[in-house]
A protein has these predicted regions:
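Flexible, low-complexity linker and terminal segments
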Residues: 4-223
Length: 223
């Protein structure tokens, strides 16, 4: 729900990462226990003046109007364009529109700073930290409890929550990234953000981790 509302407010696509186990599984949950989210209203055109789809704003989000509205022409252009959507090669205009996009990214990052972008399970200072995403979380939590380790699960990957992540990883000790893929996708992304997990535990035979299997492999890499 949060991803959809932010997508609507900031006029951007939202990608919700899933995996094979989640896609093929069936789960039950208490809908009443879900945290309610406030409606995020989009910046809509007020109906006055000439419509500029890419008008500069402080937040970087331009007023939205839908194609088919009377008196409105909505232009979508994949090339560098001006505020109305017409192609341009004027350097000042191109720079201004690029800076508008950067402001939008900054506004989104500022709003996400209030969102719990990183979840943790277990006590800080355990000396061992398991990083995971997706359906591996449940096996990781159980295996980590047996090993006396802590589990860290990033919930937002872009814009990456640098401050929350760095605060969470203080005193992490030995770190391993557990993933159900062959290339260590999350570990690679973390390295791009300046954090190297150092160890990876990968499984890519199309099956989820079993707790005993994961516990043995974590004990091996943490030894």
């Amino acid at each position: 729900a949060t991803a959809l509302m932010l997508s609507w407010k900031y006029q951007i696509p939202s990608i919700i990462l899933t995996d094979k186990t989640l896609a093929e599984g069936a789960y039950s949950f208490d809908i009443e226990a879900l945290t309610p989210h406030p409606d995020l209203e989009p910046a809509l055109r007020d109906g006055t003046g000439e419509y500029r789809r890419y008008a500069p704003t402080e937040s970087g989000v331009s007023p939205l109007a839908f194609p088919g509205r009377r008196g409105v022409v909505v232009k979508a252009n994949s090339y560098a364009h001006d505020e109305a959507g017409f192609t341009t090669e004027e350097s000042g205009v191109v720079m201004g529109l690029q800076e508008k996009l950067l402001r939008k990214g900054e506004s989104l990052a500022a709003e996400l700073a209030a969102y719990p972008a990183v979840k943790t399970y277990g006590a800080r200072g355990a000396g061992m930290t398991v990083i995971c995403w997706g359906s591996e979380k449940w096996a990781c939590i159980e295996a980590a409890e047996n090993l006396g380790a802590r589990v860290v699960q990033p919930l937002v990957l872009s814009p990456f929550p640098d401050r929350a992540w760095n605060e969470t990883m203080i005193g992490a000790g030995k770190v391993a990234c557990v993933e159900n893929n062959a290339t260590g996708q999350l570990a690679r992304l973390l390295r791009q953000q300046g954090f190297d997990p150092g160890r990876s535990v990968l499984k890519y035979d199309g099956r989820p981790f079993a707790v005993d299997e994961l516990k043995a492999r974590l004990a091996e890499v943490f030894a």
